[in-house]
Design a protein with these regions (language model features):
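Conserved core of the PLP fold type I
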Residues: 66-195, 212-213, 220-229, 235
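N-terminal small-domain helix-loop-helix segment of the aminotransferase-like
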Residues: 2-6, 10-101, 108, 289
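Short glycine-rich anion-binding loops that position phosphate/pyrophosphate groups of nucleotides
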Residues: 43-45, 176-179, 242
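Walker B catalytic acidic pair
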Residues: 208
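Alpha-helical elements of Rossmann-like donor-binding domains used by nucleotide-donor carbohydrate transfer enzymes
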Residues: 52, 56, 78, 155, ...
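Residue-level marker for buried hydrophobic side chains located in beta-strands
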Residues: 204-205
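PLP-dependent aminotransferase class I/II
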Residues: 233-300
Length: 300
């Protein structure tokens, strides 16, 4: 087993780094940030990237050509293999659509399956872009707020049932595991949400970008893996961005088993000019989702 050095300091100066650059942070957050700040505002790690990814990108650079690209067999087999090894979920290559980011996928889904004025259910407190996207798309934010009980956040399923029953609420975005409260939803909680959405014909889109970052004693369940009906009716979004700290490579996957939903999603994706692929993003996914990438991820 290779021993990786997570204690080596990496100099991020002159890397176009957003996290540590005070002027960039000040502009993004619209406030004054001192130059000696300690940035804890962004989900971005400060140790070196996994060598398997670095080496794959280095090898790709050596080919000295960077034209238009498309996902090939190694990309699809890597994604399918990762889901099988990590979560025992059998994903078919044709279910997978490459998208620059999970946030972009949420935007595409909202525009594909709702109309202006429709309600989109989210569970605040949640990742800020969820609400921002809904508002920017001229949809209504419908908050099924989490409740804090005995030092733990829980879902208000009774309220969710009532909100889902309203015909104007067409779609729900679930964060699983939840950002920022950190809950890893149980199989029972996920099933309850899915059944409510199925019952009331609400399209459930699940953001599972943090699926790999789960403490010992807890288990992440890909929502679509829990029931064949969920595969046919819902959408799962994932990416290596948080696991391997590669958000700058702009690579994520929408997993949509239902062909009709997938084709509608991809039609909107093209209309929004979000069907572009990043050469290095494809290489990153193919390298990260390997045994070597998993070994790096698991090291304590």
């Amino acid at each position: 087993m290779i021993k990786y050095d997570f204690d080596r300091k990496v100099d991020r100066v002159s890397t176009n780094d957003m996290k540590w650059h005070s002027k960039a942070v000040s502009s993004y957050l619209n406030c004054d940030i001192p130059e000696d700040m300690i940035p804890m505002w962004l989900a971005d790690t400060d140790f070196a990237c996994a060598p398997v990814i670095v080496n794959a990108l280095r090898d790709r650079v050596e080919k000295e050509i960077f034209g238009y690209c498309a996902p090939m067999a190694p990309f699809y087999s890597a994604v399918c293999g990762w889901q099988k090894r990590r979560f025992d979920w059998d994903v078919k290559p044709e279910w997978i659509t490459f998208v620059p980011s999970v946030v972009a996928s949420i935007n595409i889904a909202i525009r594909s399956f709702t109309n202006e004025g429709d309600g989109v259910i989210i569970q605040q407190p949640v990742y800020d872009p969820f609400a921002t996207i809904v508002k920017n798309d001229n949809r209504k934010v419908v908050n099924n707020g989490l409740v804090h009980i005995n030092n733990e956040f829980k879902m208000n399923l009774e309220e969710l049932e009532a909100l889902a029953a309203k015909p104007e609420n067409k779609l729900m975005v679930l964060c699983s595991p939840h950002n920022p409260v950190g809950r890893v939803w149980t199989k029972e909680e996920l099933t309850a949400v899915a059944e409510i959405c199925l019952k009331h014909d609400v399209l459930l889109v699940t953001d599972e970008i943090h699926a790999d970052i789960v403490y010992e004693g807890y288990k992440h369940y890909p929502l679509l893996s829990l029931d064949k009906r969920y595969e046919e009716n819902f959408i799962l979004l994932t990416a290596p961005s948080k696991t391997f700290n590669v958000a700058g490579l702009k690579a994520s996957m929408s997993i949509i088993p239902n062909k009709e939903l997938r084709e509608k999603f991809e039609h909107t994706q093209k209309a929004m000019s979000l069907d572009v692929r990043n050469t290095f993003g494809l290489e990153c996914v193919s390298a990260a989702y390997t045994d070597e990438g998993e070994e790096w991820m698991k090291q304590e």
